Every structure is written in structure tokens, then in C-alpha cells.
Amino acid sequence: MESDWKKAETIFKKIEQGWIITLVPLDATVQAKVNSWMEWRNFLNEINQKPKSTLGAFQKKAKALTLKSQELNNNIPTEFNTLSIKTRITALITKVKTLDLYIHLNPVPDKKVTGLIAEINDQVVSLQLQMENIVQRNQIPTEEGESDIIKMKDTTRAIH
């Protein structure tokens, strides 16, 4: 019994040390566009609060992150409602669900859990970079007549 407690304590300490979330600040233009996206703000708020006391607190956090990440598909701002953003959200959800799964195993595979934290960080950064990329692309002015050429190239509009 004593060794089970020590193992759990060791696992908790390793997860606590590895639970490092590093979010990159968004560009001011992107930030202004996502301010109204409540689900994104809720997810960031949840992910920024690190559990402190027990392994159970980390398990609750993983469950909460799963719910918040799944909500990211709701109310996506029009500019970001693209396949590239939705794909990154899906990848993020998958990583968070995997974290939730692993942290509830007995014994908890601490190396897997801390590895997933790093992967979740990467997914969030990837999503943020894609948002910035979209904003930058949309700021490039179109050439005169460019929109007509784009319409002509659209094969779904072609008359058959």
C-alpha cells in the first residue's frame, strides 16, 4: 500500500513538472478578430490554469480541457471558418482527448502525459499561426481584374 502511494506521488510530481503550457501572444490584428470568439477565450482560460494539488486535479483539468476544446468548433469567426483552421482544431481536440485518456489510466503513464502536453502546446501554436497567416493573406490587396480571373478559374461555376 505504501509503495502505491509513493508511485502515485512520483507520477504526480513528474506530471506537475511536465505540465508546462506556453502560449504565444497573438498579433494585435488577430487578437481583435478572436476577441468575440468566446469558445477560444474559454479554452485559453482553461488551459492557462494549472492544477496544483493532486493527480485527481490534473484528471479533472484534462476532462475540462476536452470539453472546452470540443467547443472550439462553435461560433468560429467567419474569417477563420476555413478547412485549415478546422483541421487544426480537430488535431488539437484529438491530442486533448488522448491526454484525457492517458491521465485516467492506472498507473498513469507520466512520460506519455508530459509528451502530450508538449504536443498540445504545438497544436495551439499551429492554430494561432494559421490564424495569423489568414489575416496576413487577407490584408494583401487584390490586383485590378484578379477577382474576375479567380471567378473564371472556378470550375464549379462553369457551364456544362
Label each PLM-derived region with a short phrase:
Residues M1-Q59:
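Immediate post-signal-peptide N-terminus of mature secreted/exported proteins
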Residues E71, F80-N81, R88, K151-H160:
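Extended alpha-helical regions
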Residues F12-L26, V30, I103-H160:
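C-terminal amphipathic alpha-helix
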Residues Q59-K63, L83-T90, K111-A118:
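Short, charged, amphipathic alpha-helical segments
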Residues E71-K86, I103-D110:
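Short, solvent-exposed, charged loop/turn and helix-capping segments
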Residues K63-T66, Q70, T90-K97, A118-E132:
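Generic structural signal for well-ordered, non-transmembrane alpha-helical segments
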